[in-house]
Amino acid sequence: MRKHLLLCGVSVVSFFYALPIRGQEAEPVDSLEQTVQLLYENKPVKYVNGAVSYISGAEIENVPGSNRLNALAGRIPGLSFYNIDGLPGFENSTYRLRGEHTFSDNRAPIILIDGKMDDASSLDSYDIESIVLLKDAAAAGMYGLRGANGVILINTKRGKEGKIKVSFNTETSFSQPTRKPKYLDAYQYGLLYNEAQLNDNPGATPKYDAATLEAYRSGVNPYKYPNVNWQDEFLKNNNLMTRNNINISGGGETAIYYVSANYLYNSGAFNVDRNANTYNTNTSGNVMNVHGNVQLNFGKYLKVNTDIRAKREKRNAPGAWSDDYGKDLLTNIYSTPFNAHPIMNEDGSIAGTSDYQKNLYGVLNHSGYSIWERSSISSYIDIAYDLSRWVKGLSIEGRAGFNTYTDFYTNRTKKFAMYQLMADGSYSQFGLDTEIGNSGEYKQIYRNFDHNIGLRYTGDFDKHSVDA
């Protein structure tokens, strides 16, 4: 017997701390008996061939974070993910399942919500009933080439027959970097710069003399000899996130329903000057989700199931976010030396030099703002009519689905002047102060309609069963 050892590495960029108002314990779940919606049918997990992993929605329900699928990291064998920056509103991850089988750039598994391809990044975990991963060709074969890199199936919650049940959940959490890099201060930077200079040219005159190094160390004149920890000045130690959810479910023999609403707010990752503007320049965001489904039974033979999800999300960022240095804001925090220039000059002007003309205070507070908004609706209707009166086990089933989203992007930018303190006490200016303007906006609309109809037959013969 061959044994294979799979080593998985998971990189976590943030720690989250949540204090639930009311603790709830989930009942044990037999994953093999759970039903998953495949391409054209519902089937118990134990009857799905191939490499399959199952996780209940209750296991990730109380895991903080705006992207709930990130909570799957370390919980399902063979699944890994990475995030390019983790900033609020930009924390969508890329997922990878073991055994990628494509040479194209897109090697991510497809994601289906209730059997329909959709965006799961902002799906609220309280609406998730279960998640199933199909990880090999045998399991994902029915999806053809689209399933070459695996399939993530998400089943959302449905109403249950009985009295009305109302549930409300609220949480407040804080995220923080697991570890911040420790950088050289101005004094250490000067020492090592001189050492590197002498290594290259032993006869060279050091750039930083003893008096300058001592001024950096003592902090005697922070405007002439700056020692700015850009990371501590502009990157928050803790980032606040709040989430509220309410859901209502119930029903009887003729109708079963489930309705939920969720609101998520992320305060932003940077320290901004709230007195500098009347508008928000932080990388904050909020998401509002509404989800509802109804199952109607018209007599013994006709069943209708409708589902609709609506989402409204908004992301905010500095105006320079649309420019190169805006996108590389974190990189600039980590690449600007402590002694490059002070944040502000002694006269209150924004500091800068000929070598460093991207003052982080100016980028965050005086470059304008940008707003990205998306409104989306995803809906479908399933109709099933039982033909058992004529052929036992035969039914006709159909589905029609509609997806639409509208993106609206607004960018209002302005420029700011920076001033460098010269040796004679004067200032040299770089750039100009401008008024905020309408530098760009666009609107994008996407619509998709899909439908299918077919016959289905199910039957049992002795110890055999047929479902086609």
Describe these PLM feature segments.
Residues 166-170, 259, 306, 381, ...:
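Membrane-embedded beta-strand positions of outer-membrane beta-barrel proteins
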Residues 183-190, 275-281, 321-333, 411-423, ...:
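Flexible, surface-exposed loop regions and adjacent strand-edge segments
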Residues 1-290, 304:
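Short, small/polar-rich motifs associated with maturation and membrane association
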Residues 177-179, 223-262, 266-270, 281-358, ...:
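Flexible loop and strand-edge segments within Gram-negative outer membrane beta-barrel domains
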Residues 405-413, 440-468:
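Carboxylate/His-rich catalytic cores and anion/metal-binding grooves
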Residues 159-164, 253-254, 269, 301, ...:
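Short loop/turn motifs that connect adjacent beta-strands in outer-membrane beta-barrel proteins
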